[in-house]
Amino acid sequence: MINNLSISSSLIPDKQRGSVESQVFYLTNRVLRLTQHLQLHGRDYSSQRGLWKILSKRKQLLVYLSKRDKLRYDDLIGQLGIRGLKTR
């Protein structure tokens, strides 16, 4: 079991704990932990549902941020190393 999957909290300053970036940061950490859990326990369907809910919430926040401030969105995607939103 790998314990080093969490992202460094130094990416988010202390004064911005409620910002969209910090919320996406914490949700990404939860996604990484749940993904690791589901690799060990593949048939844990309640955890799968929780993961889907977290991913949905993170996506909503990323859509909001991409509409409000594209530069902050691009910077956050780059720092966290997650895939950007699909565009139509």
Curated annotation (Swiss-Prot):
This is Small ribosomal subunit protein uS15c. The keyword Ribosomal protein applies. Part of the 30S ribosomal subunit. NCBIfam families: S15_bact. GO terms for biological process: translation. Belongs to the universal ribosomal protein uS15 family. SUPFAM superfamilies: S15/NS1 RNA-binding domain (SSF47060). It comes from Pinus thunbergii. InterPro entries: Ribosomal_uS15, Ribosomal_uS15_bac-type, uS15_NS1_RNA-bd_sf. It comes from the Eukaryota. Pfam families: Ribosomal_S15. CDD domains: S15_NS1_EPRS_RNA-bind. It is found in: Plastid, Chloroplast. The lineage of its organism: Eukaryota, Viridiplantae, Streptophyta, Embryophyta, Tracheophyta.
